[in-house]
């Protein structure tokens, strides 16, 4: 059973260094021949739906629908407050890994209490989406068990919304992510709200490269704070044995300006380019599994528990 660490030490003066995965696993192209048969079998039972679970097109942010006002307001607050300085401060706050000790499945269950207010496609508790994504990947890539598990856990950083973690506001946890310390690309959802972000008026941060060097690699780029980065750092701290492909997907799955619009590629290095096909592959199941198809939790739980035991310690420091 997880437990909360009652007394927190003082915050350190600087954040922990961002670490690349140390594994040297060979990267496999998800379009390789050995996956083709499995993908074809999957496509007979899962095809990209035309509409999301609310009956609208996917990722539509500029039309009126039942959740549009709330989504727009979240991005307005997000884009005003996600500054380079804020990003550094909140990393110091949350990368001490002293908020809780609990296992992976317990953290999945915590998300039952939340709906992502930034998501125009989904109005269900998060655990439904996690299992939909994991099962969709499992059918398409039956031999890649790490990929199934990645689908299950990819949003677990949203536990930051829970009182155990200080009830962070949704704008600091969910939504699309983007680099801080350089110009905000126009492809970012609701780009217009960056006009009120102080970094938009700071000459250090307004050029294409900003404080970075071209080709420096995404691991050297400070991203807007959210559940992606938090979970990535938790997994690194707890020495997961998931391959680097999984960690890259977890860290950048909300970076739509990159994997959907092709922005910020000038900051990528060779490692990032090798990982990117897996991010594209994952997004198909992350986005288009948001439907009314329900997953029998008790039926699939034993399978995922075996994967959790394979790749994680019994309890993790969060």
What do these predicted ranges mean?
Residues 1-106, 113, 318:
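Non-catalytic interface/linker regions that flank or bridge core catalytic/transmembrane domains
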Residues 2, 12, 51, 66, ...:
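Compositionally biased, low-complexity repeat tracts
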Residues 122-298:
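Divalent metal-dependent catalytic cores for phosphoryl transfer on phosphate-bearing substrates
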Residues 299-318:
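C-terminal helix/juxtamembrane-tail motif
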Residues 91-128, 211-218:
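Active-site flanking loop/helix segments enriched in acidic
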Residues 7, 11, 45, 114-117, ...:
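Surface-exposed polar/charged interaction patches
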């Amino acid at each position: 059973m997880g437990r909360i660490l009652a007394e927190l030490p003082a915050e350190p003066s600087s954040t922990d260094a961002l670490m690349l995965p140390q594994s040297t696993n060979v990267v496999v192209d998800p379009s390789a021949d050995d996956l083709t048969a499995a993908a074809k079998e999957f496509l007979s039972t899962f095809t990209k739906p035309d509409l999301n679970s609310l009956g609208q097109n996917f990722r539509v942010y500029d039309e009126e629908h039942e959740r549009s006002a709330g989504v727009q307001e979240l991005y307005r607050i997000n884009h005003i407050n996600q500054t380079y300085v804020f990003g550094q401060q909140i990393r110091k706050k949350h990368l001490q890994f002293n908020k809780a000790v609990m296992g992976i499945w317990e953290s999945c269950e915590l998300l039952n209490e939340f709906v992502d207010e930034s998501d125009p496609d989904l109005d269900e508790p998060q655990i439904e989406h996690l299992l939909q994504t994991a099962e969709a990947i499992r059918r398409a890539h039956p031999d890649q068990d790490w990929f199934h598990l990645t689908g299950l856990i990819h949003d677990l950083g949203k536990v930051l919304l829970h009182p155990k973690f200080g009830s962070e506001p949704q704008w600091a946890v969910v939504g699309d992510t983007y680099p801080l310390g350089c110009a905000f690309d126009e492809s970012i959802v609701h780009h217009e709200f960056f006009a009120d972000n102080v970094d938009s008026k700071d000459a250090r941060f307004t050029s294409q490269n900003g404080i970075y060097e071209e080709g420096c690699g995404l691991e050297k780029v400070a991203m807007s704070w959210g559940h992606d980065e938090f979970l990535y750092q938790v997994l690194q701290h707890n020495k997961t044995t998931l391959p680097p492909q999984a960690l890259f997907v977890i860290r950048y799955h909300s970076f739509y300006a990159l994997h959907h619009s092709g922005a910020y590629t000038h900051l990528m290095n060779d490692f990032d380019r090798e990982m990117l096909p897996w991010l594209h592959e994952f997004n198909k199941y992350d986005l288009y599994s948001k439907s009314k198809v329900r997953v029998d939790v008790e039926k699939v739980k034993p399978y995922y528990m075996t994967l959790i035991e394979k790749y994680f310690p019994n309890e993790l420091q969060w």
